[in-house]
Amino acid sequence: MTASHSETPSTKPDASTFISDHLQVDRSKLSQMYLHYVETKDKYPHAVLLYRVGDFFECYFQDAVKLAQELELVLTSKQAGEQGRVAMSGVPHHAWERYATLLVEKGYAVVICDQVEDASEAAGRLVRREVTRILTPGTLLEEGMLKSSRNNYLAAVVIAANHWGLAYADISTGEFLTTQGSDLEHLTQELMRLQPSEVLVPTNAPDLGSLLRPGETSPHLPECLPPSFCYSLRSQVPFSQGEARPRLLQKFKVRSLEGLGCDRFPLAVRAAGGLLEYLEDTQKENPVPLQRLRTYTVTDYLIVDSQTRRNLEITQTVRDGTFHGSLLWSLDRTSTAMGGRALRRWLLQPLLDIKGIRARQDTIQELMENTPLRQDLRQLLRQIYDLERLTGRAGSGTANARDLVALADSLSRLPELSHLVTESHSPFLKALQKVPSVLEELAQKLHAHLVESPPILIKEGGLIRPSVNPLLDERKATVEADQQWIANLEVDERAKTGISTLKVGFNKTFGYYISISRTKADQVPANYIRKQTLTNEERYITPDLKEREARILSARDDLNQLEYEIFTALREEVAQEAEVIRNLSRAVAAADVLCGLAELAVHQGYCRPEMLSGREINIVDGRHPVVEQSLPAGFFVPNSTQLGQESLVSSHLSLADNQEQITNTSLREAAPTTTLSTSDQGQMTNDNPDLIILTGPNASGKSCYLRQVGLIQLMAQIGSFVPARLAKLGICDRIFTRVGAVDDLATGQSTFMVEMNETANILNHATSRSLVLLDEIGRGTATFDGLSIAWAVAEYIAVDIRARTIFATHYHELNELASIVPNVANYQVTVKELPDQIIFLHQVQPGGADKSYGIEAGRLAGLPAVVIQRAKQVMGQIEKHSKIAMGLQNLD
């Protein structure tokens, strides 16, 4: 059967003339093909069904309408038997991946129902079709459907009261991990870190199998799950302990889950088992070769919540969501796709383990000091393709011949890598020193069997080199002889007819034919049989040509089938070595990341931070890693930071414990009634604070300084060198930021309410080992309200939490806090004030500022001169008469 795409479609068909819902049809009146379509659609009611008909994949009924609307295609109709016409839309079969990708990106699941036999084999019956692929956002494998620089995670969650289990996998790379926790906020943050393309949720919802697109809601979706992901509602049965545990044992061929590290995490086991069942359901005959399940604990890593990732612009910018201008952009010097993904994972999951951090630092230092090794490694790494995903496609049976050639090219580079790092002492480089001989042999075999530049399609021949298989060579000789017979026929027929433009052609519909221009039709011999008339030519056949055609096509089919069998055998050999290849590919990825970080450190002048077990943050001449690269060399003004000295904390605790001077309670009671002159405030600067009150003009660089400290700490905990002259850094358990705020219209929250929610999260979760970066707390409400909240927040962090904190503010009254809380210090971003302007020096120095120069910032921004002049007049009046200028003196 072939698609009737020759029908003239209407771009705006009258919906009343065809049926657009498969549930409304009388199935007894449908033709065989449409009945099969409807029965298949019944099994996948929530997916878009692409149904192969000849050279097209077609959609009918409601899926046709959906396809046409979402991809802006023509919606037409086709006759479906006695039932009448039904809605139809379609795409060419050779381009199905592109259209399916667009649908998946929009949050749809796509079912591929393909023809599994040639139409010629059907012999008058319905061509056999089967579901061969189910594509969902989290189960993509094809290269064109994936972003090389990031993982494509499928996640599964199980929630029981406040406890939760999470499993996630990237089937394109084989990664498979699981974890469990007792704080739902940690689950939310893990999902935000992973950014899974799809999340499986067990439920008793009536619409099981449905896929909720981002932003769609369901009463069956737990409230703690962020609305920004695709959610698949699944049956609870595969997520039960009784089904999940045996499935994991069978998958990994183990007798106990103890070896996988998840035997004590029942919710994690349930999530992992449910995820495996989903892969079995969607991947059909293409089992996914997952790596061995790994179990981890969220609190084993530095926690960076979604707000902090956004504010620090770790993977994308706040302004326009682009990669360029992010921390990842500034650090990424990787040479492979695997390395790029690994660097992204490292940034989103920094280490707490000092030993692990130092091991990475040692490797970077070795590569910095050995320039020839670093340069040779980078040059060789550029020649290695994406081993992880190439292996994944081979293991799932979707790799083509070009994939295997790329894999062979990459594997053949590994012995060279091994030779380069022979003398290295780094555990990361030592992992490359021994390449299993089986991989070298596999690369040689692939190169020996596959042609250098094979076609994309794997069932149409042209894949295998000569002399690989005697039977293949014999069949190739037969086909070549047939091709020569065709060439000779063309020459002979030209001579017989005297028609010099005569050609012998071929297409899949008519087979071989003789083409003659219509102007020469009167010269056609009597034994020619007209087969087709076109605008400028006539096409003919002869009995001899048709007789030979059957032999030619049969021989070519036999040849193509044998090539396909040889190719699939090679692909299966690759799949058998998937675990070995992936183990080595992880080593390549880590080496690539560290090599890139070494290159970055050399060219940007980074230093090796000394990692400490205490709370100290001591940065000398630190620089913002992104802003620095965006400015001409030497333009960035470095600044130092000192926080969290243990000696001061011990002294402070001693004072509080002995109640000799100031207790925590007395601090809060004394604060409102204690006042200093502005000049005194500027002098109250402790040398080793836990909390810095940072004041200074608008646009002077306070926010940049805050982010700079956070980014340096984060970089250090992934093992990177940092942009500073010197750095001594204690390990942080969490980095919190509250920088800027906007209205959350979706939840009806004002800017101030968003700010308070973020601040509450920090106060409720920060510890003495956290780093807190606050910018402008309390500015979204009345002045005294905001000042009061800002004071109370700063005081609580300094006294009760003792987190290392930088608190940027325009409330200069907060400088008074340093006079009564010993672990608070005042710092300011300085300016040079001239008679008619100010010059921002961008230098952070001890002392508190007493002006914000907001009017000057307005002038620089282009406010009209008359507005600037009036603002100065109003300010003069306020300073003379308003109680605002009196600070905290009368708050009691």
From Swiss-Prot:
Q: Which cysteines are joined by disulfide bonds?
A: none
State the SUPFAM superfamilies in the record: DNA repair protein MutS, domain I (SSF55271), DNA repair protein MutS, domain II (SSF53150), DNA repair protein MutS, domain III (SSF48334), P-loop containing nucleoside triphosphate hydrolases (SSF52540)
Q: Where is this region: Disordered?
A: 663-684
Instruction: Enumerate the Gene3D superfamilies for this protein.
Output: 1.10.1420.10, DNA repair protein MutS, domain I (3.40.1170.10), MutS, connector domain (3.30.420.110), P-loop containing nucleotide triphosphate hydrolases (3.40.50.300)
What's in the keyword line of the UniProt record? ATP-binding, DNA damage, DNA repair, DNA-binding, Nucleotide-binding
> Tell me, what does this protein do in biology?
This protein is involved in the repair of mismatches in DNA. It is possible that it carries out the mismatch recognition step. This protein has a weak ATPase activity.
- Into which family does the record put it? Belongs to the DNA mismatch repair MutS family.
The identity of this protein, by name, is DNA mismatch repair protein MutS
Gene name? mutS
